[in-house]
Regions:
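Conserved donor-binding/catalytic loop of nucleotide-activated donor transferases
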Residues: 120, 264-266, 282-291, 311
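Conserved nucleotide-sugar phosphate-binding/catalytic loop shared by glycosyltransferases and other
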Residues: 5-13, 36-82, 320
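Glycosyltransferases and closely related glycan-assembly transferases
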Residues: 89-102, 110-125, 138-143
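Active-site-proximal region of nucleotide-activated glycan assembly enzymes
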Residues: 40, 59, 118-180, 185
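C-terminal alpha-helical cap of glycosyltransferases
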Residues: 353-374
Length: 374
């Protein structure tokens, strides 16, 4: 495939909710025939991309930029100077790379490279996979060549329904076929009902408390295993694990990057309502209890979760309704009604068809071709 040295710059970062979709787009471009060396990732020096970007194997640049805090914070004093310097650095980078297209996946880390693309006349695509677009997505959408959205009814200009970016390994996942090997890899028993709790790279304190309480209530259950990803910053406060010898098996992990294996191994997941998580659950057909983060801008995680829950493709519990008793009751109900669990999984998989369609990569390539033809 004939293309300039850099075909695409993919930008966005800070949290796994932006970094993983960015890397998913990079994977999709490679699967479409573009050379790995022709895809350049741009993120921040402070987010999870400091670990994920080097491991992914793409050329990358990490800029010194921080997000604007909603509350009064000394970090806000550094926001504007760092943003100006990062944008200048991004402009220099873009002049050297001369990409055919820039893909913005949102978050404060995506602003410098996208603004530089706009100033240099490089066509860019805004990828918005939340029901309610974030601030950077809304700002950048005004001059975008196209906006790729995951849900119907987007207010963004030139919006096209493409589904959300999902990693190739997850798109191809067969949960039933891969479950035995996934459980071996994660050291989970084959004969227990496995609940995986994973609430993003930072974890979730309120969910962690509810899970800890639920584990205490179910301490003598020999038919249940809980694989709890508490978040690295919460490991020190986490309850001790239980080996399952005479009751529940409870595994506590700070961070887990083997999400395909976790989706395959789990009978049921407990998650937050980030758009990337919702798209992955649907793509693989994994039944889940979704507890939206109440601190999300405009409470958009509730809207994301409703995309599945209103189709009977997930259970939605808002955080103010969550405790160990409620969580345990919902898990018990699904554990002993496998027919209902299977229906939820099937409806989730049906909802994920748009994310498995490949339409997002097709849109990006079309924008790149149109830009080159100018």
């Amino acid at each position: 495939m004939n293309e300039p040295a850099t075909f695409a710059v993919v930008t966005g970062g800070g949290t796994s909710g932006h970094v993983l979709p960015a890397l998913a787009i990079a994977e999709g471009l490679v699967a479409a025939g573009h050379d790995r060396s022709a895809i350049h990732y741009v993120g921040t020096r402070r987010g999870v991309e400091t670990r994920l970007a080097p491991a992914a194997g793409y050329p990358y640049t990490l800029l010194d930029v921080v997000g604007l805090q909603r509350s009064l914070s000394r970090r806000n004093l550094a926001f504007l100077p760092k943003l100006v310097r990062a944008t200048r650095a991004a402009r220099t980078l873009m002049r050297g790379l001369r990409p055919s297209v820039v893909i913005n996946v949102g978050g404060y880390g995506s602003f410098p490279a996208t603004w530089a693309a706009r100033r240099l006349g490089v066509p860019y695509v805004v990828v918005s996979y939340d029901c309610r677009p974030g601030l950077v997505s809304k700002l950048m959408a005004r001059r975008a060549a196209a906006c790729a959205v995951a849900f119907e009814g987007s207010a963004l200009p030139r919006a096209e329904l493409t589904g959300a970016p999902v990693r190739q390994r997850i798109v191809a996942l067969d949960r039933d076929r891969e479950r035995p090997e996934a459980r071996r890899e994660l050291e989970l028993p084959r004969d227990r009902f496995v609940v995986a709790v994973v609430c993003g790279s930072q974890g979730a304190v309120a969910v962690n408390r509810a899970v800890t309480d639920m584990v205490e209530r179910f301490a003598d259950r020999t038919d249940l295993a809980v694989y709890h990803v508490v978040g690295e910053r919460n490991v020190g406060d986490a309850a001790p694990g239980r080996d399952g010898t005479s009751g529940i098996l409870y595994r506590v992990i700070g961070y887990e990057d083997r999400m395909p294996q976790l989706y395959a191994a789990a009978d049921l997941l407990v998650t937050r309502g980030g758009a990337g998580t919702i798209a992955e659950l649907a793509s693989v057909g994994a039944p889940a209890i979704v507890v939206p983060w109440p601190g999300a801008a405009e409470n958009h995680q509730v809207d994301n979760a409703k995309v599945l829950s209103e189709q009977g493709a997930a259970l939605l519990i808002e955080q103010h309704d969550l405790d160990g008793e409620r969580l345990g009751a919902e898990i018990d109900a699904l554990m002993f009604d496998r027919g209902r669990l299977a229906v939820i999984a099937h409806r989730a998989y049906e909802a994920g068809a748009i994310h498995r369609s490949g339409a997002l990569i097709e849109l990006i390539e079309r924008v790149a071709r149109q830009g080159s033809a100018r």
